[in-house]
Amino acid sequence: MMRGFKQRLIKKTTGSSSSSSSKKKDKEKEKEKSSTTSSTSKKPASASSSSHGTTHSSASSTGSKSTTEKGKQSGSVPSQGKHHSSSTSKTKTATTPSSSSSSSRSSSVSRSGSSSTKKTSSRKGQEQSKQSQQPSQSQKQGSSSSSAAIMNPTPVLTVTKDDKSTSGEDHAHPTLLGAVSAVPSSPISNASGTAVSSDVENGNSNNNNMNINTSNTQDANHASSQSIDIPRSSHSFERLPTPTKLNPDTDLELIKTPQRHSSSRFEPSRYTPLTKLPNFNEVSPEERIPLFIAKVDQCNTMFDFNDPSFDIQGKEIKRSTLDELIEFLVTNRFTYTNEMYAHVVNMFKINLFRPIPPPVNPVGDIYDPDEDEPVNELAWPHMQAVYEFFLRFVESPDFNHQIAKQYIDQDFILKLLELFDSEDIRERDCLKTTLHRIYGKFLSLRSFIRRSMNNIFLQFIYETEKFNGVAELLEILGSIINGFALPLKEEHKVFLVRILIPLHKVRCLSLYHPQLAYCIVQFLEKDPLLTEEVVMGLLRYWPKINSTKEIMFLNEIEDIFEVIEPLEFIKVEVPLFVQLAKCISSPHFQVAEKVLSYWNNEYFLNLCIENAEVILPIIFPALYELTSQLELDTANGEDSISDPYMLVEQAINSGSWNRAIHAMAFKALKIFLETNPVLYENCNALYLSSVKETQQRKVQREENWSKLEEYVKNLRINNDKDQYTIKNPELRNSFNTASENNTLNEENENDCDSEIQ
């Protein structure tokens, strides 16, 4: 682009003999003027004062007019022949070393007073520099610029920054990059009174042409000085694409939370436009199998669903093709070839197998599966069709698992299980059905599938506690456990003890507890002898402070009561009802209400009546405290209930503030009273005696503390022996007896606690 501009400049300077002769006369006149102005050019003020890059030079009468007329015809501003071409040759890298050196020398400044008669060009010259030129004319430009370099034998580069001029040493070939590295804030001045400046009024940082254009100034009152402006836009690093800058005027929605568009990472295929293949009914029966394979291969193309407007026609062609394949499998019976198995499995892998990153909350907090909403797959229209097509393919009566097992192998199963971590519940539901069908078809893969699922559960329990598909895997296992043959293998019992029971300790139990409870009940139905191990495992992981999780455990215990055998119930009744008694006294009314609702179950009620001699003494104190509070409420009337102090005392004494809980506890005690009144009276008497003993121990403890306080008041420090002495001997004896009584009371309490346990 610069070559054409240089060619026009050369033509202008060499166009007429009159212009060349006049220029020689101008050079001689300027040499005479330079000798007179050398004293003034040595002043630093004149060298650094020209910040606007203006140029003042004398022009010849004939030569300038002729060049001006030619410049107007070509759409450019008049220039001064060879000297102008040497200055403008700095706009781009010269084609020859001579042109680059001459252009850089013409841009430098001389302290000794040597001047050059360069005249700056205007913005029109910059526009002309973008046009295409011939390479041969750039060589002429180099020769013309070298002649101008001879006129300046000792150039010195001076860069002014922050009103301070720094002079460099004499360089044989000063370059533009050297000037750029100095980052000048003021133009480079020359003593001759001419200046070369770049046109940066457009302010474009994306300017691809690093042009330093010369322009004529209209202000003649400025001091005659020559300078070079190196614009910031000419820096090489600023030519790189810059990031989008925020507009301060625009309003930013800082409250809006970012949205994740997909829970997995698909890799779209290279864009290849799809063409609609003919329908199956449009071809002959012999061509349907090749057409089937061609349609399956066509579905291997992946689309980017992050851009809804991208290739809408291609997405629709793929969806309709999958629908045609599904309809063809359902409505036709034919023998599947080996090639069909390979292409179908390959298409399933390409469309569905992909890495699934861990879920991350876009706000920045830890992802909570209970509160954060899952992100659905944007490509679900195609994924759903692929799942349905593969499911129809596997369920088809023409499917031969002997041929398919070389394609649906262990690696296929592992990748399929990884997809269960998808956040999209629709995909997990399709995966559940697909894996279950594969488990039923491929007998050789059953043990591997169970073992792989066990590994996922173990990693979930003891390492990550994050996996989205636990509920779906447990649902598959529920149907698998239901089909176990009796007696159960040791492998299945180990799975119950080491996998299913420890699953209760995970914090996100609520996501899969119904499926887990179903698996536990299925095991107990298969083998009732496992009841003791299951109940003791639940009591081991029983929550201490999480009331919501405690209600889940109580629901599971209720399900176990439905299938428990009477003989197995006897083995676990003591530890189980000790925990249930604690739940009855729980301040959380839903926990107490859930336990007391067991008495509405007829089977549970029969078990309690048959084993009342063991059960009633354990739960009687908890039930009696609730009923005594109900009697207190009835005796005092409604006024006492409205009293806030009575409500606080009620919550402390009875363990529950809900009156409905008191009524349910009274109903449970009434059942025991009616079925076995003798046992009820014995338990009542035992409870009252224990209450009296507790009161006596409380009074005795208070007396002992009072004696101890009196003993401390009568102590005095013996400074000689550093021992404590008692002033009154009677107090010494009373203190000794009080300490002995405290020791005996503590031993009695420990004995009572051990007997209850």
Curated annotation (Swiss-Prot):
Residues 217-228 have a biased composition (Polar residues). Residues 1-11 have a biased composition (Basic residues). The modification Phosphothreonine is found at residues 242, 257. Residues 23-34, 160-172 have a biased composition (Basic and acidic residues). InterPro entries: ARM-like, ARM-type_fold, PP2A_B56. Disulfide bonds: none annotated. Residues 1-172, 188-250, 734-757 are annotated as: Disordered. It is found in: Cytoplasm; Nucleus. Its main location: cytoplasm. GO terms for biological process: cellular bud neck septin ring organization; DNA repair; establishment of protein localization to chromosome; meiotic sister chromatid cohesion; meiotic sister chromatid cohesion, centromeric; mitotic spindle orientation checkpoint signaling; positive regulation of autophagosome assembly; protein localization. One of its GO terms (cellular component) is protein phosphatase type 2A complex. Keywords: Cytoplasm, Nucleus, Phosphoprotein. Residues 12-21, 35-66, 86-119, 128-147, 197-216 have a biased composition (Low complexity). SUPFAM superfamilies: ARM repeat. One of its GO terms (molecular function) is DNA binding. Belongs to the phosphatase 2A regulatory subunit B family. PP2A consists of a common heterodimeric core enzyme, composed of a 36 kDa catalytic subunit (subunit C) and a 65 kDa constant regulatory subunit (PR65 or subunit A), that associates with a variety of regulatory subunits. Proteins that associate with the core dimer include three families of regulatory subunits B (the R2/B/PR55/B55, R3/B''/PR72/PR130/PR59 and R5/B'/B56 families), the 48 kDa variable regulatory subunit, viral proteins, and cell signaling molecules. The B regulatory subunit might modulate substrate selectivity and catalytic activity, and might also direct the localization of the catalytic enzyme to a particular subcellular compartment. Multicopy suppressor of ROX3 and HSP60. Present with 300 molecules/cell in log phase SD medium. This is Serine/threonine-protein phosphatase 2A 56 kDa regulatory subunit delta isoform. The gene is RTS1.
